[in-house]
Amino acid sequence: MESPPLYEISSSSSSEKPRHHFQSLDLFPNLNQNSCINNTLIEPLPLIDRINLNSNLDLNPNPLYAEEGEQEEEEEEEEDREVDVDLHIGLPGFGKPSNDAKQLKKRNGKEIATYDAGKGIENELSGKAYWIPAPEQILIGFTHFSCHVCFKTFNRYNNLQMHMWGHGSQYRKGPESLKGTQPRAMLGIPCYCCVEGCRNHIDHPRSKPLKDFRTLQTHYKRKHGHKPFSCRLCGKLLAVKGDWRTHEKNCGKRWVCVCGSDFKHKRSLKDHVKAFGSGHGPYPTGLFEEQASNSSVSETLFF
């Protein structure tokens, strides 16, 4: 009896078992192996930032030099953190700004940023910026305004502004277009006095900056400068012309209270009356003398 063909056996077995239990026959094993190898070769390389640099590969040929460089960078970062900002700005006409214009200092725990020749003033006005001008700068003041294009100087800022208009239309777009030529921004910076021992000196334990450059000029003239004005009545020397006029006007006058106290200045008498209240007031004779002096002045004007 002849054996049945193989395909009949497979057909009968396929009817008994479901098809998904069959294992697919690999008719070309060598070809499949080659395709897997090709697929592995075609895969893209990993990104550089995902490479593990802590592996056993020695990527640094000179490790000692690298460690020294890292230590130096860390020391520089620590020094930058310790020192921050002081301010010492020069006048626009006193020399050209240099590349090393900014200098860092630290005094008595106060951080200051120093600037030379007024460089970088426009960008550093915000925050706690201030100025410590030299005596020559205080006495001379802003008498020369310099053009940053041709370095021509002018005695007035308005003349400098008109001169800048001649350099091009880019300087005619309002005050913002003239940045770098305006010394008015410097005038508003708080200032410290440069005289040691002064209460407004930066090293004084109770130091306090003056409001602006003009206030510093008046302070320096009154406290540390030459006093050319002399009172013709008492001979007192004064440094500021306005103070001299006020002093001479009130020199020799005494403002008397009814309680018997007398004062040099009228405002002192007013403060006295305001502090003690009832029972105090200006002495009537002083008022009569003031009225008599006013009437004599009016008579001299009309006759």
Swiss-Prot record:
C2H2-type zinc finger locations on the chain: 145-167, 192-224, 229-251, 255-280
PROSITE patterns, A to Z: ZINC_FINGER_C2H2_1, ZINC_FINGER_C2H2_2
GO molecular function terms listed in the Swiss-Prot or TrEMBL record: DNA-binding transcription factor activity; zinc ion binding
Keyword Secreted assigned: no
Region ranges (Disordered): 1-21, 61-82
Coiled-coil positions: 66-84
Motif Nuclear localization signal, chain ranges: 221-224, 264-267
Keyword vocabulary terms for this entry: Coiled coil, Metal-binding, Nucleus, Repeat, Transcription, Transcription regulation, Zinc, Zinc-finger
Keyword Nucleus: yes
Expressed in which tissues: Restricted to the endothelium, the innermost cell layer of the seed coat and detected to a lesser extent in the other cell layers of the testa.
Protein name per its UniProtKB record: Protein TRANSPARENT TESTA 1
